[in-house]
Design a protein with these regions (language model features):
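Cytoplasmic helix-loop-helix junction between adjacent transmembrane helices
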Residues: 147-190
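Glycine-rich segments within core transmembrane alpha-helices of 12-TM secondary carriers
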Residues: 161, 177-208, 212-224, 320-329, ...
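C-terminal ends and interior cores of transmembrane alpha-helices
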Residues: 126-141, 355-373
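Central mid-sequence intracellular linker of multi-pass
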Residues: 178-180, 187, 204-273, 279, ...
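Conserved MFS/SLC helix-loop-helix module at the cytosolic interface between two early adjacent transmembrane helices
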Residues: 103-145
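Cytosolic juxtamembrane N-terminal segment immediately preceding the first transmembrane helix
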Residues: 1-87
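Flexible cytoplasmic loops linking transmembrane helices in multi-pass membrane transporters
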Residues: 4-17, 68-85, 240-293, 342-358
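Extracytoplasmic gate region of multi-pass secondary transporters
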Residues: 37-41, 269-329, 389-397, 401, ...
Length: 455
């Protein structure tokens, strides 16, 4: 631990309090996690050569293709598309990440509570970054099977992300700041989707090699790990250069800021019997069903149904997540203001925002399923859908901090790990329902998925 003199000197170098530095680095952590998670969703459209399937199957309902993929009336081969994978194989590969992701949630939450969130989160994301760098080499050497295994390992590295972040936030953020900080940190998911989609499209535009996508985001993950290791700590009391004023403030306002005392074991029996926990679980499953459908299959929808080229697909795929990110701050600010002015309780605020984030997107996706080849209408519905989903972060996403701040990691691990089943099922299900590359039928599939999700 630094001497008080040096701690005061270093703390003056920061223009903002350390809890906000942590919030920004947490945002970048989630951003980094999501770029490595979603980059394959766009890259796979350029990895697979579906020319043969498109030539052998005529779909009279397909949208007109005016993209640069048409040459003399036929679909040209993609220069770096060296794999011949069926739609079901692609769906299985896209879902592989979530197998590993679900497995390490509970162990990740336990490790974060036992040893602190800093290294649990940092080492997990570092491993995912290294696996991302290796993706081009592995898939060229072992094909779909090796890629599936690698994606499972990537998911295992990212599994502790949310539980570890919840532990860190529970020990750093006062209750009245949690909606805004939650929107800031977990809004990083949308920044990751925006950045990942846009940069993937940019790197693959023209004759760009899809391998560059994995090299770029793998290096980005390693750079984040270096910054996280230097700037962030698990608790305020272990931070070497937090100001005395902020340390005193956090110890007075955050009940779990001091972790020196021995904690009781996680009360799993009480958690499982808790009605609010079950409500939280059902809300998470419903949200993730629609969210993972969008994340994994929106790029394929843009490319194979609406016939956008890869550069346009990258940009247009990013737009709904930009709307979700902006609206997550708006929802978070509104919730905090209403609670602070006692217009409604924290519980009521969580219910309102979760309801908006669940029913609104389902309605918009159903409307998008009937937009047909109207590109502008489809994109508008997707943007509106994700914008309304922004209420999720100030709703049930931070609810674990309210229900059990001392066990937020374990509770988040249970909720996130269980709801990840949606990410396992939806990509493979859509792949099975669209065996031919004429994925115009995916429009109806997405509509049905939304209806199942909304009950």
């Amino acid at each position: 631990m630094l001497s008080p003199k040096w701690r005061r000197t270093i703390s003056r170098l920061f223009l903002i309090p350390q809890r906000y530095v942590l919030g920004i680095m947490g945002l970048l952590a989630v951003c980094n996690a999501y770029t490595m998670r979603v980059c394959l969703n766009l890259a796979v459209t350029q990895m697979v050569n579906n020319t043969k399937s498109q030539e052998s199957h005529y779909d009279p309902n397909a949208c007109p293709d005016d993209s640069d993929l048409l040459v003399n009336g036929t679909v040209s081969s993609k220069p770096h598309a060296i794999f011949d994978w069926s739609e079901s194989t692609q769906g299985l590969i896209l879902s592989a990440f979530y197998y590993g992701y679900a497995i390490t949630h509970v162990p990740g939450g336990y490790l974060a509570e036992r040893y602190g969130g800093k290294w649990t989160l940092g080492i997990g994301l570092l491993s995912t970054a290294l696996f991302t760098l290796l993706t081009p080499v592995v898939v060229k050497a072992g094909g779909a099977t090796w890629l599936f295994i690698l994606r499972v390992l990537q998911g295992m590295g990212e599994g502790p992300t949310m539980p570890a972040l919840m532990i860190v936030l529970a020990r750093w953020v006062p209750p009245h700041e949690r909606s805004r900080q939650g929107a800031l940190v977990f809004g990083g998911a949308q920044i990751g989707n925006i950045f990942g989609s846009f940069m993937s499209g940019f790197l693959m535009a023209g004759d760009g090699d899809w391998a560059n996508v994995f090299y770029f985001f793998g290096c980005f993950g390693i750079l984040w790990f270096l910054a996280w290791s230097l700037l962030c700590y698990s608790t305020p009391n272990t931070h070497p250069y937090i100001s005395d004023e902020e340390l005193k403030y956090l110890n007075e306002t955050v009940t779990s800021a001091d972790t020196k005392s021995v904690r009781d074991p996680v009360p799993w029996k009480a958690i499982v019997r808790s009605v609010p926990v079950w409500a939280l679980l059902f809300a998470a499953v419903g949200h993730d069903w629609g969210y993972y459908t969008m994340v994994t299959d929106l790029p394929k929808y843009m490319t194979d149904v609406l016939k956008f080229n890869i550069a346009a697909t990258g940009t247009l795929t990013a737009m709904p997540y930009l709307a979700m990110w902006v609206c997550s701050f708006i929802f978070g600010w509104v919730c905090d203001v209403c609670v602070k002015r006692k217009w409604h309780s924290i519980k009521t605020g969580r219910i309102i925002h979760t309801t908006v984030a669940a029913t609104g997107p389902a309605i918009c996706i159903i409307l998008a399923s009937y937009s047909g080849c109207d590109r502008y209408a489809a994109v508008a519905y997707f943007i509106a859908s994700m914008a309304l989903m922004g209420g999720f972060y100030s709703g049930m996403k931070v609810n674990a901090l309210d229900l059990a701040p001392n066990y937020a990691g374990s509770l988040t691990a249970m909720i996130n790990g269980t709801s990840t089943i949606s990410g396992i099922i939806t990509p493979y299900l859509i792949g099975l329902l669209t065996p031919d590359v004429s994925i115009f039928y995916i429009i109806r599939v997405i509509g049905r998925v939304a209806r199942w999700c909304s009950g």
